[in-house]
Amino acid sequence: MTPGLLTTAGAGRPRDRCARIVCTVFIETAVVATMFVALLGLSTISSKADDIDWDAIAQCESGGNWAANTGNGLYGGLQISQATWDSNGGVGSPAAASPQQQIEVADNIMKTQGPGAWPKCSSCSQGDAPLGSLTHILTFLAAETGGCSGSRDD
């Protein structure tokens, strides 16, 4: 065998092809992940409290009873603790407040705590959520995992 017949270029071709495939998959994954993060960030910014179907959350949280006071430390249709109510502009008891007053305080809670304040039921607020909004994403995820039935187990 003559020296020089096997070249490093010839031996490296399968490795180059594999490297290109791995690189392509990595880049495509990075692009998709970046788009998802950007979408989530934009949807959080553009998602307004008006996009939330508070009646659906109340139905999930308290069976739609806006005057709920079951003794579990959570009050009103949206099942808000007294401390959270007070720190977000509520006056008196959530159970004694009108649905509109509860929604106004809930809007403040949503701004500071996000949908995590209602971990199970916020994804049930399908309403007219814009495509890509946080409510839309949560609704989709809840539907996929079978959430949205019953009330929160606090």
Swiss-Prot record:
Keyword DNA-binding: no
CDD domains: RPF
EC number(s) given by UniProt: 3.-.-.-
Biological processes per GO annotation: dormancy exit of symbiont in host; negative regulation of gene expression; positive regulation of gene expression; quorum sensing; regulation of cell population proliferation
Main EC class the enzyme belongs to: hydrolase
Protein name in UniProt: Resuscitation-promoting factor RpfD
Gene source species: Mycobacterium tuberculosis (strain ATCC 25618 / H37Rv)
Disruption phenotype: Not essential, disruption of rpfC alone has no effect on growth or survival in liquid culture, nor in mouse infection models,although colony size is reduced. Alterations in gene expression are seen. All 5 genes in this family can be deleted without affecting growth in culture, however triple deletion mutants (rpfA-rpfC-rpfB or rpfA-rpfC-rpfD) are not able to resuscitate spontaneously in the presence or absence of O(2), and are attenuated in a mouse infection model.
Gene3D superfamilies per UniProt: 1.10.530.10
